[in-house]
Amino acid sequence: MTNAIQNRYDFVLLFDVKDGNPNGDPDAGNLPRIDPETGHGLVTDVCIKRKVRNYAQLVKNGAERYDIYVKEKAVLGRAHEEAFRELGIQLGEEYKGHTTKDVYEGLEELGVPPGITIDCDEDANTYILTVAADADKKEIKEWLKENKPVKGIKDVINEALKQAKTRKPSAEEVEQGRGKMCDKYYDIRTFGGVLSLKSAPNCGQVRGPVQLTFSRSVDQVVPLEHSITRMAVATEAEAEKQSGDNRTMGRKFTVPYALYRCHGFISAPLAGQTGFGEDDLNLFWDALCNMFEHDHSAARGQMATRKLIVFKHDSQLGNVPAHKLFELVSINRVQNSDKPARDFSDYEVKFDSAKVPAGVTAEIRI
């Protein structure tokens, strides 16, 4: 794409947290993420990408070419269908039909053929079999031959196929859909995405030009657990049980202080495939610098971007391995400091700008 960036970039991002939980782990009761072998704190790349998306959505407010694909409460399949409609590509029609509990349980045990989903509402005692608009009927029939389900299941699926008016996009149409999604959604153009949903028109896969590592704390962290009290209860039953005391106990997890380091990479060749241009790049830098200013919450405490050092290569493929550039940025504790770090001033960030190789320019953006 002609307006795409023409240079490779690598960057170092430093951010910190004070008395907050920068990225809770849902598999560990929302405790701050930690490397169990070293005790260093972790923040996932997905967490940072979420904040970039939120910032872009806030600043651009859904402007043309700057909508966000993965946003809160989004139904992703709708975006695919909308893209195909805007391209004037005819789609099939999704089919939904009621079925029985026996069919539901049978397919749950056997597995569901590609292009078909089955859902249940146990409260309403209803079971819905859905054939996707782009389901491949031939592929489903092959599945029936290979898996040989019982007659009741086979009959239900065959009847659904008769009723369904499916149409699978051609390879050329899939590529058109992919291009439309890249053009319309900033986060797809930036980070890429898997756009081959089972329940929506296939838009292929996109490798994003911008990629991030996990962020790792400079020093080990010790998460703290705090008891908190709410001076109210949710139900009358709780109030009666507490004889009117009406208190609810809870837990809150924080990191007293941690400075995190993240590395990032921006590929010019991949930017050419998605149309990631200079305006997109500038928005990305702005997001990294300001994302925490619009993401405050009681759980996250005080977070801030402390440093963003950008290395720009004078070629698309780059002139120096990224790790050699990252080694120019070092972080050390200030001298004569034997107490745990509790502020950014407890660290000294050094950047050896004199050793930046030829063919690379460095910029300290914050």
Task: List where the protein language model places each region.
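Basic polyanion-binding and macromolecular-assembly surfaces
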Residues: 1-46, 50-366
